[in-house]
Amino acid sequence: MNEFKPLLGKVATGASLTRDEAAYVFDKMMSGEATPSQMGALLMGLRVRGETVEEIAGAVSVMRSKMLSVEAPSEAVDVVGTGGDASGSYNISTCASFIVAGAGVPVAKHGNRALSSKSGAADVLAALGVRIDLDPAGISRCIAEAGIGFMFAPSHHPAMKHVGPTRVEMGTRTIFNLLGPLSNPAGVTRQMVGVFAKSWIVPLAEVLRTLGSQKAFVVHGSDGLDEITISGGTDIAVLDEGRIHTFTIMPEDVGLKRHPAEDLKGGDAVHNAKALRTVLDGAEGAYRDVSLFNAAAALVVAGRAKDLKEGVEMARVSLDTGSARARLEHLVAVSEKLAPEAAQ
């Protein structure tokens, strides 16, 4: 820990850490070797100055090295958001994940309980009857048998227990809000990541490139959503075989209707679970359209659709044939069968 103080001093001057230096301090933090004061000072120093690509890459490399891994097919994708967008939206990425699975793409979904909203991915899945307490082998079985599996972040990142209390006491966004979506325990190299600010789409695409992702969309909606929105435009940074480019897309560009942002609002886990089921049952409206749009992006990232317009059509087929709904029912059944008490 004798190197922690000098590196903290470096951050205090406004200087950036190298990737190796960032890896060092985050290893100390996630090993329980840094004090709460040191952790709080470092996290706030990075936040105020602005975290760099190298710092995030160094921190993610440590988080990945300490996580409990899950085996998944190499073509598996994740659809995930950083949260922190204060939108209170319905669980868009979770619904989109079932649509993607229904289109034949394996999904390794990584998520947590609600942090800033009323219902996180773990909350709504539990309300739908999915067991979120499976071990890595059980999750791998879910992906193999149901086409989708859920990895509950706290179960796969035990080292985070060392920084959790400091994060709670700080009560503000830190670099850790960015690390979770970049630390999928299944090691997916194809992902759609939603972020809480437009300024982060290119830096996070650069981090994913540095860490070996094949293809990714990093997205931010003009209404503040950490998803692709249907109330206006969405800014997207695309990583594809080492190259990054950006574009802005509107719902009309892919044949979807525009809806006001308030129509995307959700409620608690029970409310959102009911809403998600209605979408999978074929209900029309804003929830369906925004889920189609986000699923389309994941299908492009997976290499199944050539563009977002084709992705929307593939997503429609997944919904309208009942395939997406079947993925949910299958996941509920398989996860229940593999639950800890069922194995006793």
UniProtKB/Swiss-Prot annotation:
List residues binding 5-phospho-alpha-D-ribose 1-diphosphate.
81, 84-85, 89, 91-94, 109-117, 121
Sorted alphabetically, the keyword list is: Amino-acid biosynthesis, Aromatic amino acid biosynthesis, Glycosyltransferase, Magnesium, Metal-binding, Transferase, Tryptophan biosynthesis
Summary of subunit composition and partner proteins:
Homodimer.
Residues holding anthranilate 1:
81, 112
Output the SUPFAM superfamilies linked to this UniProt entry: Nucleoside phosphorylase/phosphoribosyltransferase catalytic domain, Nucleoside phosphorylase/phosphoribosyltransferase N-terminal domain
Positions annotated to bind anthranilate 2:
167
Q: Which reaction does it catalyse?
A: N-(5-phospho-beta-D-ribosyl)anthranilate + diphosphate = 5-phospho-alpha-D-ribose 1-diphosphate + anthranilate
KW Nucleotide-binding (keyword) present: no
What class does this enzyme belong to in the EC scheme? transferase
Q: In which pathway does it act?
A: Amino-acid biosynthesis; L-tryptophan biosynthesis; L-tryptophan from chorismate: step 2/5
Molecular function per GO: anthranilate phosphoribosyltransferase activity; magnesium ion binding
What's in the GO CC field? cytosol
- The residues listed in the UniProt record as binding Mg(2+) 2, with positions renumbered to this chain, are 226-227
InterPro entries registered for this protein in UniProt? Anthranilate_Pribosyl_Tfrase, Glycosyl_Trfase_fam3, Glycosyl_Trfase_fam3_N_dom, Glycosyl_Trfase_fam3_N_dom_sf, Nuc_phospho_transferase
What top-level branch of life does the organism fall under? Answer: Bacteria
Q: How is the cofactor bound?
A: Binds 2 magnesium ions per monomer.
Which EC number(s) does UniProt give? 2.4.2.18
Task: Identify the residues that bind Mg(2+) 1.
Answer: 93, 227
**Which family does the UniProt entry place this protein in?**
Belongs to the anthranilate phosphoribosyltransferase family.
This chain belongs to the protein called Anthranilate phosphoribosyltransferase
Cofactor(s) needed by this chain? Mg(2+)
Q: Which gene encodes it?
A: trpD
A Gene Ontology BP annotation from the UniProt entry: L-tryptophan biosynthetic process
Main role? Answer: Catalyzes the transfer of the phosphoribosyl group of 5-phosphorylribose-1-pyrophosphate (PRPP) to anthranilate to yield N-(5'-phosphoribosyl)-anthranilate (PRA).
